[in-house]
Amino acid sequence: MLGFSYVKSAAAILCVGCLAHCLAFAGPPVASLGHTRLQGAWTSSESAVFRGIPYAQPPLGPLRWKPPQPIALQPGVRPAIQPAPSCLQAFVGWNRADEDRGSEDCLYLEIRTPRVSRKARLPVLVWIHGGANWGGSGGWVTDSGLADRGIVVVTVQYRLGVLGFLSHPQLTHESPHRASGNYGLMDQIAALEWVKRNIAAFGGDPASVTVAGHSAGGQDLGLLLLSPRARGLFTRAIQQSGTAGFGLPPRTLAENEKLGATFAAILGVPQDDMQIETLRAVEARKLLDAQMLLESPSLADNSFIFLQAVMDGWVVTGPPAELLRTGKSAPVPLMIGNAAQELLLYGGDSAARRAVARIFGPSMDQALSLYGLRDGTQPPDDPILGSTAMQVAADDTFRCPAEFTAAAHAAAGQPVWRFQMERAAPGQARIDHGSELTFIFDNRPLNIAVDGVRPLLQSYWVNFIQHGDPNGPGLPQWPAYGGKRAYLAFTQSGPEARTALRAPICALLQRP
């Protein structure tokens, strides 16, 4: 039986420990940015979260279609608890929540950190959300469990649709760089500059910043990797189901200016010297209605219209394919991958045949043979890659562009780790677009069958964010891409190292 003095001593120690814990979290977390103190909130896991942090002036009125402008925060305490609105966006079927809470005043970021201390110097992840540059937001990633594994997580809002990617001759003329059309990318660059200046106040290391993006976020990150404007702002990159160009033909500045003139005509704005000023005065929701009528002559599907890279000569200095081939990508470690069944192509094998003719051109016959479509028979579905139509769509838009990006980056002497997700997210029948996101970022409980997958994927991602290499103790080896074009397949039975993903098909495409 324990003596009374032992029990009393143990109780005293427990009380002291509890008191120290309570004192540590007695007040809200505060990050000091010069004369401004941002007041956040503690999470249930005792990390700190700061929301609604402006990184640029609201792009309203005369600042519509202008590069992001620096913002000076007022001295004193500023609450950073309420989420910022999503960037204004048209409803396109999957983004109702973000569309409902959208605002043109949206240039904010969120931060979740394990320690609010300048001495912590923790690695940083900056997340660029997807959504075809039409819609979406990234706040849900702020609530991921990565902060509980020693990562400072930052999510960025950026202008979307015509508000983020419109060119116009008058906009080009008023620019000191004679460029227009990449305001959404400029927002991302401004956010990265803000992170470099200020992340130490939140416990982050400005010399250890990884940028990750999914879908359009992966495409935008690919363009940032190629842009001299973003050079030196991050040290590692993770492109998930998105590459610079997405295999789509880029638009020249002149082509995007022509699209801008068409946009003004749709709105009935007079074609005069004040056209852009008149457009700046148009109610924002009317702009969104008009953007739904825009068409790009080089696209088979206009839902990709804001995924076509705009070669403005300032942010994007040339065709992404050429920039990649000539070694213009930033010299940083890269993780890049895709899901096995990224995209549906409606219409079955007949649609697949039409797509092959359009995509492969002079190599059409070879491609038809590789897909098993040449003799007019209907090939069986692949258990991992899905139907033939699904394979064609994913190869063209995701899988082969990721291969080309990995190969170009490796040829420039940079370390590359390539992956393909080959297991569905919980509750999903298909290994579709974003299948890996649930395992990496979602904090909700998973069923027993997939509980082991989350720590595995999170460990690979955390290791890469920390060290630029996903490998670590206790993990199956993930070989670098290198000359063998190695990749890791995340299968139903676990990770499998393989080589030369879809090599015969991708050799016929040869475009990023």
Q: Model segments located where?
A:
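Bacterial N-terminal signal peptides that target proteins for export
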Residues: 1-12
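Non-catalytic accessory segments of hydrolases
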Residues: 2, 24-182, 303, 343, ...
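Bacterial N-terminal signal peptides
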Residues: 10-21
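Serine-hydrolase-like catalytic core of hydrolytic proteins
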Residues: 91-272, 276, 293, 314-347, ...
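Short, solvent-exposed turn/loop segments enriched in Gly/Ser/Thr/Pro and often Arg
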Residues: 159-161, 212-216, 420-427, 476-482
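Substrate-gating cap/lid region and adjacent catalytic-acid/histidine neighborhood
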Residues: 236, 244-245, 278-281, 285-451, ...
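Polar, surface-exposed loop/tail segments
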Residues: 281-282, 468-494
